[in-house]
From Swiss-Prot:
Biological classification of the source: Eukaryota, Viridiplantae, Streptophyta, Embryophyta, Tracheophyta
Gene3D superfamilies (alphabetical): Hexapeptide repeat proteins (2.160.10.10), serine acetyltransferase, domain 1 (1.10.3130.10)
Protein's recorded name: Probable serine acetyltransferase 5
GO molecular function: serine O-acetyltransferase activity
Pathway(s) of this molecule: Amino-acid biosynthesis; L-cysteine biosynthesis; L-cysteine from L-serine: step 1/2
GO biological process: cysteine biosynthetic process from serine
Amino acid sequence: MLVVVARKSSSSARVAAHQTRSHRAAMPAGQPHAHEPDGGGASHRRPQSPPSLPAEVVPAFAPPESEDEESWVWSQIKAEARRDADAEPALASFLYATVLSHPSLPRSISFHLANKLCSSTLLSTLLYDLFLASFTAHPSLRAAVVADLLAARSRDPACVGFSQCLLNFKGFLAIQAHRVSHVLWAQQRRPLALALQSRVADVFAVDIHPAAVVGKGILLDHATGVVIGETAVVGDNVSILHHVTLGGTGKAVGDRHPKIGDGVLIGAGATILGNVKIGAGAKIGAGSVVLIDVPARNTAVGNPARLIGRKNGEVEKDEDMPGESMDHTSFIRQWSDYTI
C-alpha cells in the first residue's frame, strides 16, 4: 500500500523539524550523524558544489516529465522511512543516515551506494562525490532512477514500498551504479569505470560492462548472477530475472552482444548469445538458450530456443508487453494449443 503524503503546512513543517531534531538527540551514543565520519573510513559529509559532467556523455534518456514525479516518489520514501523507524527502533539510525537526513533522492541514493560499494582503498567519500556529481548534473539519470523505482513497485509483488527497493533491492542498486560507470566510460575515465564495475560484481553479484547501454524502467528481479556484456543494448521497461546472461559467442569481436527491445521479459536462467535482436514485447522463457533473432511480441523457449506457434501454424504473439505484465507462464498453462 502506498503511503500518500500531503503537502505540509507551515505548522506541520515546524512539527516535522522538531521531530527530526528530537530523533537526532535520541540516537544512541557514539552513533555518527549524517555529516560526521563513522570511524571506519566512511564519511557522511556532503559536498557543497559537486563537479559537473558534460551532458553529451550521458545516454539519451528523456528528462523527467516534471519535477513533481521525482518529488512525489521522494516524499513516499521519506514517509515510509519515518513509519519504519517508528515501528522498528533497531532500524532508526540506519533509516536516518540513509534517507531521513538527506534533502533529496540523489543525495540519499549517492550516500547509500557509496557506503555499499566502498572498500578500505576505495573510500566512500570519493564514491559519494562521484555519484552525486552524476545525478546532480544529469536530470536524465534521475529520471531513470525514478522510472526504475516505479517499475519495481508496480511489477514485483514482493516490493512493499519505494524505500524497500531503494535500500534493499540489489538489482536496483546495481543498475544505478552502472549508469554512473557508463558515464565514466564515455568520459574515457575507463579505469575508474571498470573499478566500479568490479565493486558492483563483488557486492551485488551483478556484472554489467560499463559500455553496455541500459534504458530506464528496468527491473532486475532478484538479480543474482545477471551478466550483461560490453556491446549489449537493453531498451526501456525491460524485466530480467536472476542468472540471465546477455553474452557473446566467445569468438566474435566488435559488436557481439544481444540487443533487447522495449518491454521484453527474460525469464530466470535464460542465456542470449551473440549479436541477436530480441524485438519489443518479446518473451524469453526461463532456462532458454537463445541464438536467433526473436521478432517483436513473440515467445521463445527451449535449448536451443525456438519460437512458439499455434497448431494452425500461426505464430503466437503477446497482446501486452511482457516486460511490464510479468506474465511468465501463460504459454505453459495453454500448452496443448501450441507447438514448438
